[in-house]
């Protein structure tokens, strides 16, 4: 391909896209951990004679035991050991013992922003939560009167809520308990009436509360406080004092955090030092004063919008980990105190006091089972990148799906340039999980900032550094979008400019604009910014497009898009899938697995490439060098491609020839018709690597053995196994083939009667083992690419009870087939309905057959017209041998810029190729197409172009499934559901109605009995089918018996009787006490021999 053409200047260079993860973890190592270690030091015992100090600033980390690759291979955790110098002081003797103590393992972040936990790569998702601070809210009571309340929310500790009522009284609630008068709290804090009146701007409002309640002295107030918080206990002044102290003034119990203090000072106009993290009486008075002003509606005060991003902050890895470390250290503190008390003070040493277990457990729990620690989505590089930039409102301390209303999920004006308004899941999590916008960054307080250019008297100052602002700072400024037109000197063109001001969209003159957004892609996320012509798509479809790009399977031969947005190289680079040169230099050595760069200064840097590794999603991770020996490289240049990248650019799909036309109904309802070329030429072929694992365990009857001596298996089935019974690398396996031979010892009871008989006759002791081999599951086939053996002797850590673990990796090439799901980048998705031979596909005037035929009805109602622009510009690109980068939102280059650009490029292509049919002025973008079967032209010209289509991870191979007999549920005895359980197809209530409507009585009877949960009936039916006899009459479904048992458990005497004569006989139809079968195995039907007399042929 020729060099790419820029149709718009590239967006301002994006910042490092994974910085949010790395910076947060760096902060944890440099500050967060030290902060925690110092906050809980010193620990004194209950008598006060022993003190244990932690010197947090001098903590050390020892080198990791394994590197990243080794940790993955051994199922280990990539972590470092933490050591802290401690000092134990005995105050009685003055003796000081110093020692370095091990306090636990800390998982370490890899340079890609992930963690390796038990061999799996995981990501800690950023959580977006309500910021600590004070929030004012107005509510209407049932009489329609407006009342106000204020909530003081700390980082941790008790909530304090102030409210006014219809009589104009001020009340306080502590931690949502009973309300008490504000006067009680203020007096209990030790404030005198004069001090209170001095601080309030409208003391007369507060006076009403005193008139109603009467005066309280400080002691009375403390007693009243105790009475309200601890009803039923005798109140004391000291008890009230202690209660108040521990609730709001003890730094261990109450913490506003740096952010809470900053927000409180800002909202209430205070000047309290930011080291004071607990409440002060000044805070409480100022909060009440603000509430009274709000109630009197005197201006200068306003209620808060809790969904505004100035009131929500991001907690990233570092902070989440810090909170978890705090939990662990608190448990540790308790243990240390107990040990100090119990042990003899002379023999004590810091090492004997500190037990690393509680801290290790807390950290393990966080990484292993927290809602925010997620198995990384590694389907392709974009999925990985997006996962690290995800913002979740769920998780500990956040919202739950059920409780979250519409307001929280909605797009808020303050999201502009901070959270992407488009990328969010469909379904119950919509709006609760978002993605960070491309240029957004998180500041020290956890608020999201976004950059702007300063505007001075109508001129955009791009020569100055961009200014980063939080949502709060931006509120009172007039900010124009990033696609306003400017002249060469930077002056804004036009007389009325659209701006955002105080969360509203208005217009103003260029002179009054304060700031301009940095770039048009600033408001959207990385995945969304990869959609060309995004501005022509409906938001719902753009959402699907963003989400489906993350599900694209890496293909065998990746191909860059002809029409991109210019952000593909950076997305690939920051995902960590490609290798970049660290220095300016020369390539001194390169082969398929290794690259060496020699810097100009003489140092050598070596890189081992990942070859055909399995990703978390079973896709294939493979790196290929794209440089040659002797090439000059610059710092940051891509030297090796990863999966789904080409020449250092993201390449998720393929450019293929597409036409929008109906074809024999095969593209009805979004179905897709494709050409055989896509199968034969491996255009959409992907490699999938699956892991199969088996462990040999220690059982009661002896150890399980991995061996090729398997009972009742022919030599043919063992031909691919080595002498240990393990498949050899390179073998081709299909479903049912043995991968690892394993035998399990079995006891006497396990033997079937025929074996007992043989042993009784011949007295020969058959080998008492059962075949328990690992076999290839149904519907799978492929080539064995790797076998790994783990044993205790080699020093591997195995699960308890296992002697050996064998892992077999099987790779399969999956070509595209009917039932696979494909999609474009604009939310246009569909299932392949038919694969046509090339000669039957419609063809162009020059004889080129189409690759894919899409339904034109998929465009107008869905309003994703971007796909039409893309396919036409792609067509021009192919003919001109050029690639285009189209920045989204291109109206700054003139009205209808997209259409004019595409038409201009198509005309150019017509001129260059000399083919008039390429672009017709009468029917722009449409071409006469011929039917491949008859050679006749179709009635009307159709839209033809090159579209970038992806193959998604929802492959039909993983979904198709059949069951003849299989496992049954224990309680209902009905077949299980789902492919993984070898389940059946659920025939639900509505499906039964459909059969009832047709009166299909026998099909219905079978469905509800022998095919489902009539245990005796299904065994008999199976026997009858095997022997070729008539199927006997069905019995009673087990679920009916369960219902009867439940009714009987409610003491209802219920039974079902046969009606043989007018006067009913006591002949039970369903006998719950009769055992169906003494020797039945509940999970599978048994073959029982039946005499001919058992089957009544007349019953038919």
Curated annotation (Swiss-Prot):
Pfam families: RNA_pol_Rpb2_1, RNA_pol_Rpb2_2, RNA_pol_Rpb2_3, RNA_pol_Rpb2_45, RNA_pol_Rpb2_6, RNA_pol_Rpb2_7. Its EC number is 2.7.7.6. It is an enzyme of class 2 (transferase). GO terms for molecular function: DNA binding; DNA-directed RNA polymerase activity; ribonucleoside binding. It comes from the Bacteria. GO terms for biological process: DNA-templated transcription. GO terms for cellular component: DNA-directed RNA polymerase complex. Residues 1079-1089 have a biased composition (Polar residues). It catalyses: RNA(n) + a ribonucleoside 5'-triphosphate = RNA(n+1) + diphosphate. Keywords: DNA-directed RNA polymerase, Nucleotidyltransferase, Transcription, Transferase. Residues 1064-1100 are annotated as: Disordered. NCBIfam families: PRK00405.1 (NF001616), rpoB (TIGR02013). DNA-dependent RNA polymerase catalyzes the transcription of DNA into RNA using the four ribonucleoside triphosphates as substrates. Belongs to the RNA polymerase beta chain family. In cyanobacteria the RNAP catalytic core is composed of 2 alpha, 1 beta, 1 beta', 1 gamma and 1 omega subunit. When a sigma factor is associated with the core the holoenzyme is formed, which can initiate transcription. This is DNA-directed RNA polymerase subunit beta. It comes from Synechococcus elongatus (strain ATCC 33912 / PCC 7942 / FACHB-805) (Anacystis nidulans R2). The lineage of its organism: Bacteria, Bacillati, Cyanobacteriota, Cyanophyceae, Synechococcales.
